[in-house]
């Protein structure tokens, strides 16, 4: 392991393992990469065991350039943060085929003095930074201000990232992190081909969903031993793809969840396993939106000091008692028909009779949206019911 892609994938599955515990039989959707970049903002100012724990969970020391002698004034290898920043800049750069809206910020109770050098570093490296706010005597108003900021940064898509009563007069610092994604496929699904088809939630229960359909050349793989198959659906521009991991059986998701790991995923999506074939693809139209308080998840993973009185954030504030009271995360994405190239009806019609292989996503599955250049997992999800 030695790349941001590998680090994000390892972290992704560690988070998933914990989220599964708290959200049995529910849809799950989150952005491992942006959680890492949010924790990196904290890591900049963390010291001693607080810093060690974050590093152990996120594995910053596995990144190229981690131990370089060129130290930033923030006391952390610049390369780690600049490589995260470069990917963030790359994916959030405005273009006509996909859009990312990111809101990531620390909010500290205003009575804590914040070190100017920390503010400078976090602004340079993460464009977001830290705001001081009045939790002590106006907690609900502070919550409203934070929610409004996130809503405006995400074009109105993510509302109320902080739930009522999630902050109070004792709140020291809150980490908020929210991301929205909309993208065009390389090959569009035609609107008129979308129709209501039953999605089998369990062996006994099904519900109608809007099922998109197309025939085309796609990279696909069947894993007989794992009883599942994988499909890659490229977004326009080729820098990102959605990967769908579909169990063979309606009830096969649990086995897949138990099996999946960084090593397995790397093996499954490798070029010597995936092969391009002409297939019929059925994929539900989906709107994914989930919000999490990641405090318990990160604590279960081993970041405990950060959320307790043992926190050492002396690189952020000279006040010894600063800690994080809550880490809020929200992710939103839409999967719909729009794409860059539309395949003509005549071409598709001629294919329909000659193509027999199907990839029919009509029962629970796992999926991820991956940045192909760096192999970073931008989003990971479980769909029990679209």
Curated annotation (Swiss-Prot):
Question: Where does the UniProt entry place glycosylation sites?
Answer: 293, 312, 372
Q: Under the cellular component aspect of Gene Ontology, which terms does the record hold?
A: extracellular space
The compartments listed are:
Secreted
Q: Does the keyword Repeat apply?
A: no
Q: Which residues carry this modification: N-acetylglycine?
A: 2
Which residues get modified to Phosphoserine? 69, 345
Q: Supply the SMART domains for this chain.
A: SERPIN
The intrachain disulfides are 74-121
| Tissues in which the protein is found | Major protein of egg white.
Instruction: Kindly state which keywords UniProt assigns to this record, in alphabetical order.
Output: Acetylation, Disulfide bond, Glycoprotein, Phosphoprotein, Secreted, Signal
Fetch the Pfam families from UniProt.
Serpin
The task this protein performs is described as: Storage protein of egg white. Lack protease inhibitory activity.
Know the name of this protein? Answer: Ovalbumin
Which organism does this record belong to? Meleagris gallopavo
